[in-house]
Amino acid sequence: MAKKPTTGKAVKKETNSKLSFHKQLVLNRFMFHFFKDGTLQGLKNRLGEDRFEGIHEDGQSLFFHELSNYLFEVDLIDLDELRRYDLNIVQHWQQITEHRNRKEDTVLNMKYFQYLSLLFTEIYLDWYFNRKQQLLDGLNNELAAYNAENDKTAKDRANQFKSYILDDLNKLAYWNATGSGKTLLLHVNILQYLHYFQNGNTHHYPDKIILLTPDERLSKQHLDELENSGFTQYQLFDKSKSAPFKGTIEVIDINKLADEMGDKTVAVEAFEGNNLVLIDEGHKGTGSAAGAWMRRRDKLTRDGFAFEYSATFGQAVAGGNNVEAVETEIQKKKAKLLFETTALGKLNEEELAQIALTSEEKRDARIQATREVYGKSILFDYSYKFFYEDGYGKESLILNLNPEEDKKDERRYEYFTACLLSFYQQQYLFNKNKEKLSEFNIEKPLWVFVGNTVSGEDSDIHAVLRFLAWFLNHETQAKAWINDLIKNKARILDTKERNIFENRFTALMNAPEDIYADILSRLFNTTHSGQRLRVLNLIGSKGELALQVGEAEPFGLINIGDAPSLYKMCEEDTTFDYQRDDFAKSLFHTLNDKDSRLHILIGSRKFTEGWSSWRVSTMGLLNMGRGEGSQIIQLFGRGVRLKGRNYSLKRSTPGERPKGLHLEKLETLNVFGVRADYMATFKQYLEDEGITPSDEILELNFETRPNMPATRLKTLKLKDGYKDNQRLGFKRVYFPELYEVPADFQGKIKQPHIKLDLYPKLESIDTSRKGDNTPVNVRNEAKLDYKIISAFDFDRLYLAIQNYKLQRGWSNLRVDKQRLIDFCTGKRLC
C-alpha cells in the first residue's frame, strides 16, 4: 500500500521578485520525491549511460533493472507497481517504433530522459485514475513546502501558489528541448492515457481525441508522424464532414478555433466533452492573445484531459503571474470602474465587499495565471540547458552585425560573404568526407535564412536576394574578401577589436585554389561564372519561389505566405532576373531528400515552430528576436538537432573525432544575425541557464609527449570468441537457422520446455474447513493439439519473431517461415 508522500526538502531561498521558473515546478518536484536522491542529476548519474538503453530478455527495460536495485522509494510505490509501469512503457514504445525501426533499419531505444518522462506519466495517470484524492493531498503537501521556502519577504511571497484543487489535475505539460523527441513522447502519451482510460475495455474512448498544432502545415506533418508510429485512425479536422469514429485522432491547427463559428473557424463549444487534447508547442497560446486561448483551452479540456508540449515554457510565461496577482488585477479593474481608483488599500470594508470576486471570476483567474498554471502542471523539465549539458545537439557560434554597420552596403556584403564562406566550408567538408561521416549520421548542410518582414521597402527576404545577386555579379570583390578571410586578415572586428573570423576557416587551407568557382559548383549548382540570379515564380505551388543561376538546377527555395507580393518586388529589381513557371511542382517537400540539390531555404517566422529537418547547419537571421524570447529558442532549436553517432543525438567528443575530418565544424550551428536584437537576449538566456556563450570560451591546446615505458603493461584479456564483436564471436562464426542448435553445441543446451499456467492466483480463507486438507498441485494439464496449431496466424508469428530478432540484435539468425510452421506442427526439422 502506498503511503502519503513526504514533503519537499528546503532549498536555498531567493529574494528576487520572480524565481527562476525551473524552481517553480511543483508537480515536477513531487514526482522526483518518488525516488531516493530524487533529482534529475541523481537519476542521470544512474541511468544516463548508454548501457542502460534497450530491453532486457525478460521484456523489462534495462532502466527498470537499474532502478529496481535500490534507487526506488519503496514506501511510495512497490516493486510490482514499478514493474507494471515499465512493461506498459516498453509495450507502448515498441508499438510506435515498430514501423520506424523497419524504415530506418535500426532500433530506436529510449534515452534516460524520455524514459523518465514516460515513467512519471505512468505514475501520474495511475494515481489520477485510481488514487485521485491521494494525488491531490500529495501535491498540496509539496506545494506547502514550496510556499514555505518562499515566505521570507514580500517579494518571495509573490512567487507563492494557491493550493491545488481537483480541476487542476487534468493537465500535464512537458518542457522538453527541441530535438529531444517530443513527437514520440506525444504518441506514447496517447497510448498511456487510453490504457488507463479504457481500463481493459478497448472499445471505450474519449468523446474526441484532438491534436492541436500551430499551423496547417504542421498539421499535415503530424499526420505523417502518426502514420510512422503505426496509428491507423487519424485525419485533419473538417467541420463540413460528419463526426469520425470514436478513437480517431483529429488534427487541427490552433488558428481554426474561435469563440463563434466562422467561414474558416469553428466554435470551441463544438468540441466540449470528455476529450483527450494534445497541444503541440503549448507556448503558442501564452503570448499577446493568451487570455482568449487559455479560456478556449479550459473549455476543451474541462471534462477531459490535456497534454502540452513545448521547448520554451520558461520564455512563454516570463510575463505571466500567479493566481493571486491575477485576482488582484481583476479587483483593481472593478475598483477603477466603481470607485475610480486602483489603490485597494484606500477602500473600506463595504467597498471591498462590492469588488469581491465571484466564483466565475475566481475560476477565470486560475485559467489566466499562466505562470502558476504551468508551474503546477509541468511534469518533466528537460529544457535546453539539460539537453546541452548532456552533450545532445550541436555547439553554436552566434554573431550579429549591428545596425550602424548594416547601413554600409560594403560592410553588409562583406559580412554576408563571411557567412557564405562558413556555410561553404561545411559543404566542402561534408562532400569531401561523406563516407567517413556516415558513421556520425551527419546530414547534407542546409543554409536557412529567416526574416521578419516579407514585403515592403524593408523586406528582409528581398535583402537576402540582393546579396546573392551581388555575390554572383561581383566576382572580383568576392574573391578578394574570401582570400583575406582564409588567410586570417582582420576585416571584421568585434567590440573588443578582435578578428571575429580568426582561424574559422582553417579547414579550407587545402581547399581548391579557386574557391569561388567551387562555391558556384557546390552551392549555386553551376559551373559558369558571370551568370545572373534568377527568381522563379512556381505558380503550381503555394507560397514558393525557386532560385537558380541562369538555366542551372534550382539551388534555393523561398517559402513564405505572401509570395506574389515578393515576386512583384523582384520584377522591379534590376540586379537579378525573374521568370514564371506555370507547371512547376512544389519543392519544399524535397528538402529532406538524400539527393536534394537545394542548399538554401529562405522563409519567415513560420520556421520557428515545428518544421523538422536534420540538415540545418547555418542560419541567417534578419530583424529577428526583438523581445520574442520563445521565438529565439524555437529558431535555435531548428538548427541544433543532431542525429549523432548510433542515433545517440549527441555531438562527438574530441577523443572520438577522426583527425582531418574537422567534425566539430559540421557539429556546430552557425548563427549570423543582421539587425537582430536577439543577440543580447539569447546570450543572456544561455548565461541564465548556466551555459557559457561561445565567444567567452578560450581554447588552449597543450602538446603532449608520449613517455611510454620500455616494458608493456600486462593486462587481462578475454578469450577470443567471448564477445560477439571479437573475431571468433558467436555472431561472426555461427549462422544458425530458426530452432537449429549448431553442431559445436549439441548436447550442451537444455531442450526448451514451455508451460503456460492460466490458473488465477487467489488467496482464500474458509472458516468451514478445518485443518489444511487442500490438495496441492492438483491441476488439469493439457497440450495444444497440432490441429489447433495449424490454424495459427503464422504471418503474424513470423513478423513477431523478425521484430524480436531485430530488437535483440541477432543479425546472424536465419528466420524461415516454413521452418517455423514445421516446428510448431511437430514436423521433424532437418
Feature map (PLM): residue ranges:
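Conserved pre-motif I regulatory segment
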Residues: N69-W175
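The conserved Walker
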Residues: T178
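Motif I (Walker A/P-loop) of helicase-class P-loop NTPases
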Residues: T183-L194
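Conserved tryptophan-centered aromatic signature that marks the ligand-binding surface of SH3
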Residues: T618
